[in-house]
Structures are given as C-alpha cells and as structure tokens.
Amino acid sequence: MAGRATATATAAGKDRSSFAVTCSLLSQFLKEKKGGGGGLQGLGLGLRPAPAAPPAAGAGGAFRPPPTTMNLLSGLDAPAVEVEPNTADTAADELPLIKAPADQQSDESASEAAGEKAQQLTIFYGGKVVVFENFPSTKVKDLLQIVSTGDGVDKNTGTAATQSLPRPAHNSLPDLPIARRNSLHRFLEKRKGRMNANAPYQANCTAAPSKQANGDKSWLGFGQEMTIKQEI
C-alpha cells in the first residue's frame, strides 16, 4: 500500500512538472510572437481579434461613432452597359400578316356598298330644291363630271332658268318709293278737296274787306253831293 501511494505521488509530481514546463514554453513563445503575430492569432487557431476599445466620450458624455466615408464616384469606373433593342417591335414586324377570310371580306364590301347607297343628294337648280334618297357616291362623281363638261344640259332650259331667276336687289331699289308717292298723292288730293270746300268762305272773306274799304271812302261821295246841291 505504501509503495502504491509513493508511485502515484511521483506520477502526479511528474505531470505537474510537465504541465509547468509546457506553460512556461508557451508563455515564452507568445512573448516572442507578440511583436509580429499578435498573441494567439499567429498560432492559426481561428480566434477573432479582440474588439477595439471605444473612443473616449466627449464633454457632454454622448458617444460619437467614428466617421465613415462613401465613394460616390464608383459608378464612373464601371463599364458602360449595352442596351439591347426592344425585341417586341422586331417580333411584331416579323409576324406575318393575317388575312381575313373571304366571307368576312365579302360582308365588309357589302356593308361598304350599303353605306354608299344610304346617302342623300340635294340639288339646287332653277330656284328649286330636288332631294334624292339613297344616291350612290359613284354616280355623284359621274354627275359632277357631266355638269362640269356641260353635256346633257339643254341650253333653252338654262336660259329659261336664268330668266325665271329673281332680279337682283339693286334693280328693285327704285320700286321702293312707289308707296311713298302714292301716299303723297293721296295727301295732296285730300288737301285739294279741303281747299275747294273752304273756297266760298275765302271768297266772302275777300269781298268783305273790299266792302269795308268802299264804306270808308263813301264820305267822299257825300261831299260831291253837297257841292252839287249848293250850286243848285
């Protein structure tokens, strides 16, 4: 029993001595690598560096993070990006044209023909208005060509139409004072009738002053009679 105890004690002393030796060697190695590697990081153990100490607080006690810089001109160094043309336009141009079926084309032509027929034509000629319903546009063109060339137009009807047209306004101006003349003649006739009705009274009035004038001169006759009587 005593031998086993001494054996275990000697083994423990050896282990402690070997552990102390390894610790001393490690500390010596770290001191040597302190200047270049920086402690345990140079051993390749995957240890992260210790965080940097925070800067000292300002006078107010508020923490101020270190300033950061941003490179705003980094896009100038990047190569230019080539923009591809719009593929939708090219695809639309490359698509083949789809034609409508024959039945649909015939229906469209029929509808167009019906639209041409459902038109109204109004003609002003010879002071009259003539209206044609459902007159096709193709015949309108033919009619305009005929009118422009003068074919199919009777000269007698043209002259009759021009003769039947009303006179212009400047020719009818002298006819306007006729009513005034008639009213003036009526007024003069009425005035003449009044003068004829008042004519006897005017004659008596003119005779009365002559009588008064003769009466005023009658004393001259009395003087002549007195001289004649004295002579007798």
Curated annotation (Swiss-Prot):
Motif Jas, chain ranges = 177-202
- Region (Disordered), start-end ranges: 54-73, 151-176
Q: Which GO terms describe its biological process?
A: defense response; regulation of defense response; regulation of jasmonic acid mediated signaling pathway; response to wounding
Which Pfam families does UniProt cross-reference here?
Jas_motif, tify
Processing and modification events after translation? Ubiquitinated. Increase in jasmonoyl isoleucine (JA-Ile) levels mediates its degradation via COI1B-mediated proteasome pathway.
Q: Report the subcellular localization.
A: Nucleus; Cytoplasm, Cytosol
Keywords, comma-separated and alphabetical:
Cytoplasm, Jasmonic acid signaling pathway, Nucleus, Plant defense, Transcription, Transcription regulation, Ubl conjugation
**A GO CC term assigned to this protein in UniProt:** nucleus
Q: Does the keyword Metal-binding apply?
A: no
Superkingdom per UniProt: Eukaryota
- Which InterPro entries does this entry report, sorted A to Z? CCT_CS (IPR018467), TIFY/JAZ (IPR040390), Tify_dom (IPR010399)
Start and end of every Tify domain? 114-149
Q: Does the keyword Transcription apply?
A: yes
Locations of Polar residues compositional bias? 156-165
Where does the UniProt entry say this protein principally localizes?
nucleus
Q: From the record, which residues define motif Nuclear localization signal?
A: 179-186
Tell me, how does this one assemble?
Interacts with BHLH148. Interacts with COI1B in a coronatine-dependent manner. Coronatine is an analog of jasmonoyl isoleucine (JA-Ile). Interacts with TIFY5/JAZ2, TIFY6B/JAZ4, TIFY9/JAZ5, TIFY11A, TIFY11D/JAZ12 and TIFY11G/JAZ15.
- Entry function: Repressor of jasmonate (JA) responses. Acts as a repressor of JA-induced resistance to the bacterial blight pathogen Xanthomonas oryzae pv. oryzae (Xoo). Regulates JA-induced accumulation of linalool at the transcriptional level of linalool synthase gene LIS. Linalool is important for resistance to bacterial blight pathogen Xoo.
Q: Which family does it belong to?
A: Belongs to the TIFY/JAZ family.
Reproduce the free-text note on domains from the UniProt record: The jas domain (177-202) is required for interaction with COI1.
Protein name (record): Protein TIFY 10c
